[in-house]
Structure formats: C-alpha cells, structure tokens
Amino acid sequence: MDKLFNRSFRIAQELQKNIAFIIQHSLKDPRIKTIITVSEVRLSKDLSYAQVFVSFLETNSNLTVKKVLILLNRASGYIRKLLCKKMNLRIIPIIVFFHDDSFFKGNKISKLLNILTEKNNITL
C-alpha cells in the first residue's frame, strides 16, 4: 500500500482536525488570547505519542509563544480526554505541543527574495 495512505497518516489527519476543533471550541482558558492553528501532527509508529505543531496568528514576543505552549501542554490531558470521546481508537496518543514557525520563516525568505529581485530587476 502507498505510504501516503497508511493508517498512521490517516489517524494523524483526523487528530489534527479534532485537536484544532477542541482548541477553538472547548478550551475556555482566558489566558489564551490568540488564534491557534494546528499545522501538523506527527505520530509515532505505535500511535502512542503525538507531536502537535501549532502556529499563532498574533505572536508579539517569544515569551508569549512559550506561555501559550506551556498552557497547551498543561491542557493536553483534557484535550486527550475529549479526543477519547470523539475518536474510536484503542490508544489515544500522549500529546505534546510544539511551535511551528515555518510560516514566518517562509515569509522572511519571500521578503528577502523580493528585495533581491527589486535590486537586480529580475523577474522570477
């Protein structure tokens, strides 16, 4: 079977959708004041551990990112409990949240390329 359609990939996609829904609708923590996007979920081979990569729409400082990640990791047990009710899996994976700053890095590279093309009058 093709690697893109294996069971762990499908479960990771379903986890991504459900975790995003839970964060947006079920977490009522007033300390989380930013919009959180779940960009990727990576599962271990035995499906017992999930790395959840999140990005934030409004990040003022690195300190804010760390605080929100700490809050999300503290709420991971609650999120896991809600996932257990939504998904029919034998094992609900342990969830650990990480910051995904690939959008900001990509935006920075794009700006640098635009500056270079303007300087050299090159069209890409």
UniProtKB/Swiss-Prot annotation:
It comes from the Bacteria. The keyword Cytoplasm applies. It holds the Pfam family RBFA. It is found in: Cytoplasm. One of its GO terms (biological process) is maturation of SSU-rRNA. Keywords: Cytoplasm, Ribosome biogenesis. Its main location: cytoplasm. PROSITE patterns: RBFA. GO terms for molecular function: ribosomal small subunit binding. Gene3D superfamilies: 3.30.300.20. One of its GO terms (cellular component) is cytosol. Belongs to the RbfA family. One of several proteins that assist in the late maturation steps of the functional core of the 30S ribosomal subunit. Associates with free 30S ribosomal subunits (but not with 30S subunits that are part of 70S ribosomes or polysomes). Required for efficient processing of 16S rRNA. May interact with the 5'-terminal helix region of 16S rRNA. Monomer. Binds 30S ribosomal subunits, but not 50S ribosomal subunits or 70S ribosomes. This is Ribosome-binding factor A. The lineage of its organism: Bacteria, Pseudomonadati, Pseudomonadota, Gammaproteobacteria, Enterobacterales.
